[in-house]
C-alpha cells in the first residue's frame, strides 16, 4: 500500500489543518473521528462535523488504557468499518490512533496530521503503530498504513524549542545511515533549522520523508533494511524506559543512543575518529544531549535488561544498528564485539548516580 504525503505551509495564523481539507476528508469517508493531543485547537474540525477524542500526550501516556479511549468512543457512537480516524498531534498521538485504527473492527482507515518535527519526519510515515509496555517501548502494536499524511509546517511555529530539537535527532539519523549529502546539508543549515526558517524546515521534512519512504517501500514489515532506521534506538529506548517514560523526549534519548552506537562502532574500528567528531559536533549544533546527566538513574544492569527485550532481538541474540565505513553507511547485525558494547555502556553510566559496571 502507498501513502500520499502532502507537505505545505498553510495560511499564517492557522494552527491546524485548513477547514477545506478537513471537509474534504469528510466527503471522502463515511465518518470521521478526530483524536487530538491535549491543548491543540480543534476549531477547524467543527466544519467537518467530526467527533473528537482529546488524549493526553507524552510517552508516559502511550498506554493501552489511553488508546482504548478511542475504541470506547467509536463503539459509543456506533461507528462502522467505514469510519476514518484522524490523528492530530505528535508521534505519541499518531502511534495510538494508528493502533486503534488497526484493531477497531479488524482495521479501519486513518489519516495522520502530525504537528511536531518528530512526527513529520518519522513516526507519521511508514505505518508503525502501537503503545508502550512497562517492560519495553512499543512492544504492543501493528503495522497499519495511513491513507494519507497532511504535513502543515505552520503548526511548528508554536512548537517548544526542546520538541523541535528532539525531532531533529531523527533528521540527523537519515544522513548517518544512508544519505551523506543530506548530513552535509544539515551541517551547513542547522542554525536555520533551529531558527525555524520555513524553506529549510520544508526541505528537511521532505528529504527525511523521501528517505523513509524508500526504506519502507523496500521492507514494510521490518524484516531487514527497515531496521536500520532504528540507529540509536536500542540504547535510546533503554534510556527512556530505565529513566521513566516522560523524563526524556524520544529524540533526546535517540541522540544519546546514536552517540553510544557511534562510540561502540569506533571501539571496534568500524569508523574513524573524524566521523565521530562530526557526529558529536552536529548533535551539539542541534542542542541535543550526548551524555547522561549526573543524576541519571541508569546503570549497566538496566541497560542490558531493557535491551534484552528489544524488538530486534532474534533467537535470543541482540541485534544493533551500527555505523561502518564512510558517512552514510550502517549495518544491522548481531555479529559484534559484546565487550565493546559493555565498555560503551560502562563509559556512559560511569558518572551517573546509578553507576554499576557490566561484568566482563
Description of each model-found segment:
Residues 63, 114, 152, 258, ...:
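Residue-level signal for inorganic ion chemistry
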Residues 1-84:
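ATP/NTP phosphate-donor binding region
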Residues 96-107, 242-243, 263:
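Alpha-helix C-terminal capping segments
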Residues 92-99, 120, 237-238:
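Short glycine/serine/threonine-rich phosphate/pyrophosphate-binding segments
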Residues 184, 188-301:
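Active-site segments that bind and position negatively charged phosphate/pyrophosphate groups
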Residues 169-171, 270-360:
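C-terminal charged capping/lid subdomain of soluble metabolic enzymes
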Residues 99-192:
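A glycine/threonine-rich phosphate-anchoring loop and its flanking beta-alpha core
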Residues 57-58, 88-90, 231-232:
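Glycine-rich beta-strand-to-loop/alpha-helix junction loops that act as flexible
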Amino acid at each position: 500500500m502507498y501513502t500520499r504525503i502532502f507537505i505545505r505551509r498553510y495560511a499564517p495564523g492557522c494552527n491546524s489543518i485548513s477547514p477545506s481539507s478537513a471537509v474534504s476528508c469528510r466527503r471522502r469517508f463515511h465518518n470521521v473521528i478526530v483524536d487530538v493531543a491535549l491543548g491543540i485547537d480543534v476549531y477547524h474540525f467543527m466544519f467537518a462535523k467530526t467527533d473528537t477524542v482529546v488524549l493526553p500526550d507524552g510517552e508516559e501516556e502511550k498506554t493501552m488504557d489511553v488508546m482504548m479511549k478511542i475504541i470506547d468512543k467509536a463503539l459509543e457512537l456506533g461507528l462502522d468499518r467505514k469510519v476514518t480516524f484522524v490523528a492530530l498531534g505528535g508521534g505519541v498521538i499518531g502511534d495510538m490512533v494508528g493502533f486503534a485504527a488497526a484493531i477497531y473492527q479488524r482495521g479501519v482507515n486513518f489519516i495522520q496530521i502530525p504537528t511536531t518535527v518528530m512526527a513529520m519526519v518519522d513516526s507519521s510515515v511508514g505505518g508503525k503503530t502501537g503503545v508502550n509496555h512497562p517492560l519495553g517501548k512499543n512492544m504492543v502494536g501493528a503495522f497499519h498504513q495511513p491513507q494519507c499524511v497532511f504535513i502543515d509546517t505552520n503548526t511548528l511555529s508554536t512548537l517548544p524549542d526542546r520538541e523541535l530539537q528532539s525531532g531533529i535527532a531523527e533528521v540527523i539519523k537519515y544522513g548517518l545511515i544512508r544519505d551523506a549529502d543530506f548530513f552535509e546539508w544539515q551541517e551547513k543549515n542547522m542554525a536555520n533549522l533551529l531558527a525555524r526558517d520555513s524553506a529549510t524546515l520544508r526541505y528537511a521534512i521532505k528529504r527525511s520523508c523521501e528517505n523513509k519512504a524508500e526504506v519502507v517501500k523496500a521492507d514494510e514489515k521490518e524484516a531487514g533494511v527497515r531496521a536500520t532506521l532504528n540507529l540509536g534506538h536500542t540504547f535510546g529506548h533503554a534510556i527512556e524506559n530505565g529513566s521513566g517514560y516522560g523524563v526524556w523526549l524520544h529524540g533526546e534519548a535517540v541522540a544519546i543512543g546514536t552517540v553510544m552506537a557511534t562510540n561502540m562502532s569506533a571501539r571496534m574500528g568500524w569508523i574513524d575518529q573524524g566521523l565521530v567528531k562530526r557526529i558529536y559536533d552536529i548533535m551539539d549544533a542541534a542542542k541535543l544531549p550526548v551524555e547522561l546527566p549526573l543524576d541519571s538513574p541508569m546503570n549497566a544492569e538496566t541497560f542490558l535488561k531493557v535491551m534484552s527485550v528489544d524488538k530486534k532481538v532474534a533467537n535470543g541474540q541482540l541485534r544493533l544498528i551500527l555505523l561502518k565505513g564512510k558517512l552514510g553507511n550502517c549495518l544491522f547485525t548481531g555479529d559484534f564485539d559484546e565487550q565493546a558494547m559493555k565498555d560503551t555502556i560502562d563509559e556512559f553510566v560511569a558518572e551517573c548516580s546509578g553507576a554499576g559496571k557490566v561484568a566482563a
